[in-house]
Amino acid sequence: MTDAPNTPADNAAAQAPQLRVLAQYVKDLSFENPGAPETLRPGQQAPAIDLAIDVQARTAGEDTFEVVLTVNAKASRDESVVFIAELSYAGLFQLANVGETDREPFLLIECPRLIFPFARRVLADATRDGNFPPLMLDPVDFAGLYRAQLAKRAAAAPGSESNGNGDPAAAN
């Protein structure tokens, strides 16, 4: 008797949500340094940084999804643009044992949380290579960003509740 019966713990582990990172990559990267070399002179005040972060998800196959984290940074000093950095960093994820209602939060909270450190490094390297101090992004509250997306969706459709069905296409 080498076959052991399945225990409840075995069944629970088999049904636990699983997330696999299949790939991660720079989808699009742009760095503009329009005022160089004037903006690179020593002794100038640090530029003000405007930052925008967005997350989108789309189906890429059966139980496979592409999640794109987009970061736009615009640095300005005295009403002139110092640099513009735009990054779309993506991950290809495989989900298993994730219900329809939980899929969207998984894709828009957990997946970007996993790829964020890599996107941050790419952006820091790009700004450093533009002869500026590396732009080190603070950690992002992806759950808060997701809640803001839900609120925006609910406001855009008065009288209707947010999708909530986990359809990643709704995140686009």
Curated annotation (Swiss-Prot):
A Pfam short name: SecB
Domain of life: Bacteria
Record-level GO BP terms: protein folding; protein tetramerization; protein transport
Molecular function GO terms recorded: unfolded protein binding
Keyword Oxidoreductase in record: no
Location relative to the cell: Cytoplasm
UniProt KW Chaperone keyword: yes
Residues in coiled coil: none
Keywords from the UniProt entry: Chaperone, Cytoplasm, Protein transport, Translocation, Transport
Cellular component GO terms held in the UniProt record: cytoplasm
NCBIfam families: PRK05751.1-3 (NF004392), secB (TIGR00809)
Stated role: One of the proteins required for the normal export of preproteins out of the cell cytoplasm. It is a molecular chaperone that binds to a subset of precursor proteins, maintaining them in a translocation-competent state. It also specifically binds to its receptor SecA.
PANTHER family: PROTEIN-EXPORT PROTEIN SECB, PTHR36918
Subunit structure of this chain's protein: Homotetramer, a dimer of dimers. One homotetramer interacts with 1 SecA dimer.
Official protein name in the record: Protein-export protein SecB
Gene: secB
